Amino acid sequence: MTTREVCLLIGRDGQVLWSDESDNPFLLPDSRERWEAIWQLREELAEVAHSHPEGPLGFSAEDESTMSALTSALGRPLRFSVVAPGGTVVRVDGRDVLLSEEPWWAEPLRRVSGMRREPIALA
């Protein structure tokens, strides 16, 4: 199966408000539709999640730039997360945290992204 990056906009109640996908496993290019959805859903929006189907289990430099722009545009912090084969990482108070229990939408996000969960061993 082909892998692809997928983005989810998650509401305050944990429901998926909107989704977008690319045809590339390493990149989800900016899109006008996504930015319009973010702006239209800004009152309900609590989290922006996306997949890294080929890794890494963490935020890329492009992710960092996007997170900064979103926080600035909305005037408030959001929760950001990355779902990869090895788990889910969220940004909490400026720190990256590997979740021990993933949200309900993590597994469907993996499936749509063309990846399987492959837990990593921690030292």
Segments from the language model and where they lie:
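Conserved beta-strand-loop surface patch within small alpha/beta domains used
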Residues: 1-45, 53-123
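Cys-dependent condensing catalytic cores that perform Claisen condensation/acyl-transfer
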Residues: 48
